[in-house]
């Protein structure tokens, strides 16, 4: 009897294992595995995950992705890069996605220093990686210089640092015009430049030094706090003494919260304008204890502002799903749904080389913009985004009494005979303590 049980049990067990692995392999063959990599304990990574989840839910609800004659569902694999604190952790997270999880594609990445390493790993393994957070021009310059090696990388969001600078200067210029018109300031507007000490912001210092005087403004100083500083009172005291009327910010990390809060607590008579990624989130109001009022930041979305006909439906659906306005790192949504999936369905394959050859030549609409990938001045593909009217411009938004409202582009004139205003933008508001200090 023991012999019988043993001889029956072993084949049955073997059969079960075979069926399990066969079923697993079959299921995997019907899935498109997409890695979502980012700092998942922080707002930036959470937004990357939310955008990906929303895209996958919409795609799978319609039956999945049509790959030739086959329908395949999207499966997301989350990877916490911990890249704010460790580039090594970010590198390991990307390695695991590719070698252990066998992903077909990756979206995400945030801190430039970490994304360079992620880019190397993805491209070495011929895995298409759409960056949804890092702005460095060099990420796409690599594509142009070493195309065969780096062609698997595309920028999804934001547009590059050079374009971010152009947009930010436009926001500063619009704010300066409001100050001149409403406060009667006649001399050069005094500007303090404050950028977190990070690689992506380094090129901004010489750009600010060269550009502000041409805009009729005076640079009164440059400050470079840590991206994760919790106390910036020393910097703010110096800025207050400088007499700055605009504080031009470049923050992608958590320093944006204490800076905004402490500046308003001190009632510094100056407008905060520039990039403050933390200010793009609904939690910013609570995080600053209501002291984030009047902060202006470059952004991608604000409720009721429409860049095109796709913007409002996406924003409202996102708010319904997650209870907040999306930020730019939710660009994982369009990177999956419109960049990858639409291209896959066009050509009927997951072959990365064929996807690259098609995607790099596409022009297509997404909720925040129209995507076109530019070539460099030698005619080489860069897989970088075209910036300007009709393409990617972003918006600027301001916190006004607890509401995050779009304020730019509002009669923006990027070229002679061209004026751009997006539906839903509102006028910029000046803090009352600044009005009191300057208006006679």
What positions do the PLM features span?
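Extracellular/periplasmic periplasmic-binding protein-like sensory domains
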Residues: 136, 140, 158-161, 263-335, ...
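Extracytoplasmic ligand/sensor domains, especially the bilobed periplasmic-binding protein
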Residues: 103-222, 271-297, 304
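Segments of small-molecule ligand-sensing domains
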Residues: 320-327, 341-414
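Beta-alpha junction/loop-to-helix N-cap segments that form part of ligand/metal-binding clefts
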Residues: 31, 43-50, 65-144, 156, ...
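Bacterial N-terminal signal peptides that target proteins for export
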Residues: 1-13
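Extracytoplasmic "Venus flytrap"
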Residues: 35-54, 79-87, 110-111, 194-203, ...
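Bacterial N-terminal signal peptides
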Residues: 11-22
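Short, polar/charged alpha-helical segment
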Residues: 45-67, 206-214
């Amino acid at each position: 009897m023991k012999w019988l049980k043993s001889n029956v049990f072993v084949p049955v067990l073997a059969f079960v294992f075979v069926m399990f692995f066969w079923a697993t392999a079959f299921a995997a063959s019907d899935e498109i595995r997409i890695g979502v990599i980012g700092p998942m304990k922080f707002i930036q990574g959470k937004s990357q995950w939310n955008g990906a989840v929303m895209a996958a839910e919409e795609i799978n609800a319609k039956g999945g992705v049509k790959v030739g004659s086959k329908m395949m569902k999207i499966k997301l694999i989350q990877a916490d890069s911990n890249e704010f604190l460790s580039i090594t952790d970010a590198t390991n997270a990307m390695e695991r996605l590719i070698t252990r999880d066998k992903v077909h594609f990756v979206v995400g990445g945030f801190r430039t220093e970490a994304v360079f390493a992620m880019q190397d790993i993805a491209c070495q393994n011929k895995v298409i990686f759409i960056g949804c957070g890092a702005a460095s021009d060099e990420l796409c310059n690599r594509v142009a210089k070493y195309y065969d090696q780096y062609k698997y990388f595309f920028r999804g969001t934001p547009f590059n640092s050079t374009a971010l600078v152009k947009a930010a200067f436009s926001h500063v210029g619009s704010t300066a015009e409001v100050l001149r018109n409403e406060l009667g300031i006649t001399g050069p507007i005094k500007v303090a430049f404050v950028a977190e000490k990070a690689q992506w912001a380094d090129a901004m210092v010489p750009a600010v030094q060269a550009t502000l005087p041409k805009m009729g403004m005076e640079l009164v100083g440059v400050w470079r706090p840590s991206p994760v500083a919790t106390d910036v009172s020393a910097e703010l005291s110096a800025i207050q003494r400088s007499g700055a009327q605009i504080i031009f910010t470049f923050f992608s990390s958590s320093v944006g919260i204490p800076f905004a809060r402490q500046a308003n607590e001190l009632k510094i008579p100056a407008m905060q304008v520039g990039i403050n990624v933390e200010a793009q989130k609904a939690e910013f109001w609570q995080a600053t204890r209501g002291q984030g009022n009047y902060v202006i930041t470059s952004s991608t979305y604000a409720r009721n502002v429409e860049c095109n006909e796709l913007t409002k439906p996406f924003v409202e659906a996102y708010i319904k799903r997650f209870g907040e306005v999306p930020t730019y790192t939710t660009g994982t949504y369009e990177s999956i749904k419109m960049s990858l999936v639409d291209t896959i369905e066009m050509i009927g394959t997951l072959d990365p080389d064929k996807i690259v050859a098609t995607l790099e030549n596409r022009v297509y609409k997404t909720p925040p913009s129209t995507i076109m990938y530019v070539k460099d001045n030698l005619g080489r593909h860069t897989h970088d985004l075209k910036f300007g009217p009709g393409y990617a411009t972003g918006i600027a938004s301001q916190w006004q009494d607890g509401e995050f409202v779009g304020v730019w582009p509002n009669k923006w004139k990027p070229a002679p005979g061209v004026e751009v205003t997006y539906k839903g933008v509102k006028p910029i508001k000046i803090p009352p303590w600044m009005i009191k200090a300057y208006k006679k």
